[in-house]
């Protein structure tokens, strides 16, 4: 028999001539067919197969003297599927003889569903009764006795929706531990991947669980199945196994988390159980350090996807006893509600590439990412960085303010357009200073342009997220482009430099709001303006432009049909006023779409007048259109805009502190990764500390960050501490006290600081 790891030998299937070889292809809309449905029969369509027709093979002549060998009863797919779905093993009698007589196997296309590739074993597992089906073991034994080179137990679905789905996956989904044991004992591969479209994360109906049987059991909260798959003596599952995306079972658990209390509790329980199981089965493997194809560990994946609850748990996970090395938080000292904790900064600090801080600030698509930066240790870590870089932030603010004052003075004292851009040798002092101002403006524009290009280049892989979230960066880039272009046109003595110059000046003063994020109250005000413009105002303008264009075209069309000056105003009129000498005929009020749009805009802001020229032929229709426009825009759209803006402002105000923290985090990381500052080596926060001993006896050293907390909710819980008092490391005789080793890039004497008075935000 061919081994499970080697590919099966090539063979032609056989046909006894009575099979329905229908190979129709459904060219309509492709939708995932049901794996099992009581309201729909199995699909008979299948891909074309080259088979050997046994009816064309000459049988040996019958020996009249010898007893004749009777041909066994015929088993087709419908009969076999009916038997296994009802769970009647007695009706499988004669199946083995029929397979041998016709050189068939249970994995042949004659015994699989055409649309999905479902086998009779899958059919049996799909129709369990009280978690069992009496036909499963006979099918496995018949398949083994028939000498099938391709084991039935490892047969997989072949269609694009359920590709790779196996009987083991189905047994796990049916939550039958007994069936799982039966399949594994009979050679089921525990590392088969279900990689069809239904099992991939995309829009529409799908269920991504990590493709592997172990991941499916973990994501469906079956700890007994998980334990069996990891500890069975036949083929133990590997915790390091990955799917087609490079995700392990821990990644899969992060992906199915949805931040609800019930789901989070189950995911966290399973996550911790797998970590502890991994520590027992493979103590040398760091499961949380395994990255997928995107370079994301489970912690980084939770940060990118915005899975706040599982992200909080991983950051603040604390174990005691033999599983303490799995912790990322270590209680160093506590007194009542006051607790001093050490947090593991691996993969968190921006000192490392693709850190958690950078992912939250620049690569996270979740609208609630501001809730992650206020979690410990990120909150205190960002505050530590801000305190260190705040002088640089205000230095940049002062330089930009001086630059804008120079820009304003130069723009205000612009000479007439007919004067040369470069003054002659007899130029006055004012003209020389004006030329110097233009040169400084050009240099500043080039500096801003290089800085913004560097910003977007570093985020080129996440360009869509960058454009959606980099409001001020886009404005700075536009300002820099206009500034450089205006100065080039200025030295080329082109008059169009002036409009570009004033546009750049306006953008420059608007961009001054960027530096308000250094203060909480002004920073939140800036965020409110940004959210209102990007969310509410853009939607309002889209609808408003549709109304404006439609009504403008209608008014222009009606204005062309003016009454003849000699025609009477009505039937009773006999005298028509003639224009006097020197008096020109009054033009139509809406001569073009632009004029009509400007007049209609006045109605939108409440400054329009309903008076119109008497020579209009359809005055009633024009009046009706104007009244409808006022109702739709001035009354309806403007009030909807005000209501939406109020809702946005209230939402931002409710989360003002966390949103401001996110703005500060972005500013801190931008200063660390700036065009000039990034040339220096980044500062690493925290210190290298010994927090315990690993299972192999080696010291467990982590780069940790100390955080002082006050927690009245859980202060009665007794946790093991690393120190007996807050005097810091170095106390002789304390075997649990961490011995610190100052690193090259370590923080200043952080470990020796006494406890300070704590202030809640």
From Swiss-Prot:
Topology within the bilayer: Multi-pass membrane protein
Sequence ranges on the Cytoplasmic membrane side: 1-392, 455-460, 517-537, 643-761
Domain of life of the native organism: Eukaryota
Residue positions the entry lists as glycosylated: 571-572
GO BP, one annotated term: calcium ion import across plasma membrane
Annotated catalysed reactions: Ca(2+)(in) = Ca(2+)(out); Mg(2+)(in) = Mg(2+)(out); Na(+)(in) = Na(+)(out); K(+)(in) = K(+)(out)
Alphabetized InterPro entries for the sequence: Ankyrin_rpt, Ankyrin_rpt-contain_sf, Ion_trans_dom, TRPV, TrpV1-4
A Pfam match: Ion_trans
Region described as Disordered: 1-49, 56-75, 564-587, 720-761
Location in or out of the cell: Cell membrane; Cytoplasm; Melanosome
Transmembrane segments: 393-413, 434-454, 461-481, 496-516, 538-558, 622-642
Gene Ontology cellular component annotations, sorted alphabetically: axon; axonal growth cone; cell body; cell surface; endomembrane system; growth cone membrane; lamellipodium; melanosome
Intramembrane segments: 573-609
Region ranges (Required for interaction with SLC50A1): 1-390
Gene Ontology molecular function: calcium channel activity; identical protein binding; monoatomic cation channel activity
Biased composition (Polar residues): 570-581, 734-746
Residues with PTM Phosphoserine: 6, 15, 82, 748, 760
Post-translational modification: N-glycosylated. Phosphorylated by PKA.
Subunit structure: Homotetramer. Interacts with a cAMP-dependent protein kinase type II regulatory subunit (PRKAR2A or PRKAR2B) and ACBD3. Interacts with SLC50A1; the interaction probably occurs intracellularly and depends on TRPV2 N-glycosylation.
Family membership noted in the UniProt record: Belongs to the transient receptor (TC 1.A.4) family. TrpV subfamily. TRPV2 sub-subfamily.
Protein name, per record: Transient receptor potential cation channel subfamily V member 2
Annotated gene: Trpv2
């Amino acid at each position: 028999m061919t081994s499970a790891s080697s590919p099966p030998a090539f063979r032609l299937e056989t046909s006894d001539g009575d099979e329905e070889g229908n190979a129709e292809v459904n060219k309509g809309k492709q939708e995932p067919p049901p794996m099992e449905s009581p309201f729909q029969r199995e699909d008979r369509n299948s891909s074309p197969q080259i088979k050997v027709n046994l009816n064309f093979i000459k049988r040996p002549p019958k020996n009249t003297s010898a007893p004749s060998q009777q041909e066994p009863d015929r088993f087709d797919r419908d009969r076999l599927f009916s038997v296994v779905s009802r769970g009647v093993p007695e009706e499988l009698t004669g199946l083995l003889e029929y397979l041998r007589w016709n050189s068939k196997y249970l994995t042949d296309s004659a015994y699989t569903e055409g649309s999905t590739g479902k086998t009779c074993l899958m059919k049996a597992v799909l129709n369990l009764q009280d978690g069992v089906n009496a036909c499963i073991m006979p099918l496995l034994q018949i398949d083994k006795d028939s000498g099938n080179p391709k084991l039935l137990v490892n047969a997989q679905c072949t269609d694009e929706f359920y590709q790779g789905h196996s009987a083991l996956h189905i047994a796990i989904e049916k939550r039958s531990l007994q069936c799982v044991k039966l399949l594994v004992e009979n050679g089921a591969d525990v590392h088969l991947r279900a990689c069809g479209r239904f099992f991939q994360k995309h829009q529409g109906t799908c269920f991504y669980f990590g493709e592997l049987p172990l991941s499916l059991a973990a994501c469906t909260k079956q700890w007994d199945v998980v334990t069996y798959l990891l500890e069975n003596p036949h083929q133990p599952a590997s915790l390091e196994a990955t799917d087609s995306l490079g995700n392990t079972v821990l990644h899969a658990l992060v992906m199915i988390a949805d931040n609800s209390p019930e789901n989070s509790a189950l995911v966290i329980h399973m996550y911790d159980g797998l970590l502890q199981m991994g520590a027992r089965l493979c103590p040398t493997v760091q499961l949380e350090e395994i990255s997928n194809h995107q370079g994301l560990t489970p912690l980084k994946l939770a940060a990118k996807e915005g899975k706040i609850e599982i992200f909080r748990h991983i950051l603040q996970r604390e174990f005691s006893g033999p599983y303490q090395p799995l912790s990322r938080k270590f209680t160093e000292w506590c007194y009542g509600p006051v607790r001093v904790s050490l947090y593991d900064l691996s993969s968190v600090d921006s000192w490392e590439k693709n850190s958690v801080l950078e992912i939250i600030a620049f690569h996270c698509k979740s609208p609630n990412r501001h809730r992650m930066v206020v979690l410990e240790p990120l909150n205190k870590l960002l505050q530590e960085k801000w305190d260190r870089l705040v002088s640089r932030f205000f230095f940049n603010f002062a330089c930009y303010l001086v630059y804008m004052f120079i820009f304003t003075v130069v723009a205000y004292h612009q000479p007439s357009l007919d004067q040369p851009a470069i003054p002659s040798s007899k130029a006055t002092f004012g003209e020389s200073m004006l030329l110097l101002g233009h040169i400084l403006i050009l240099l500043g524009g080039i500096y801003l342009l290089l800085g913004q290009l560097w910003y977007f280049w570093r985020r080129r892989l996440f360009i869509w997220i960058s454009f959606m979230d980099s409001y001020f960066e886009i404005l700075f880039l536009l300002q820099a482009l206009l500034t450089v272009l205006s100065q080039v046109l200025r030295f080329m003595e082109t008059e169009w430099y002036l409009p570009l110059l004033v546009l750049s000046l306006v953008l420059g003063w608007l961009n001054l709001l960027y530096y308000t994020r250094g203060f909480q109250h002004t920073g939140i005000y800036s965020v409110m303006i940004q959210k209102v413009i990007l969310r509410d105002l853009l939607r309002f303008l889209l609808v408003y432009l549709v109304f404006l264009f439609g009504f403008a075209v209608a008014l222009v069309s009606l204005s062309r049909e003016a009454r003849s000056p000699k025609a009477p105003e009505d039937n009773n009129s006999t005298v028509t006023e003639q224009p006097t000498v020197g008096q020109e005929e009054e033009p139509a009020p809406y001569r073009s779409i632009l004029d009509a749009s400007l007049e209609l805009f006045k109605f939108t802001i409440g400054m329009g007048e309903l008076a119109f020229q008497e020579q209009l032929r359809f005055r009633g229709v024009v009046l009706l259109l104007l009244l409808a426009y006022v109702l739709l825009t001035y009354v309806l759209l403007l009030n909807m805009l005000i209501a939406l803006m109020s809702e946005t402002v209230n939402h931002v105000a409710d989360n003002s502190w966390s949103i401001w923290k996110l703005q500060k985090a972005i500013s801190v990381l931008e200063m660390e990764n700036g065009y000039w500052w990034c040339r220096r080596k980044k500062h690493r926060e925290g210190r290298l500390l010994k927090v315990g001993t690993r299972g192999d006896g080696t010291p467990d050293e982590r780069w940790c960050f100390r955080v002082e907390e006050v927690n009245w909710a859980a202060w009665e819980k007794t946790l093991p501490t690393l120190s007996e008092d807050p005097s810091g490391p170095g106390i002789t005789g304390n075997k649990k006290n961490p011995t610190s080793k100052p690193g090259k890039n370590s923080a200043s004497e952080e470990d020796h600081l006494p406890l300070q008075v704590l202030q809640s935000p």
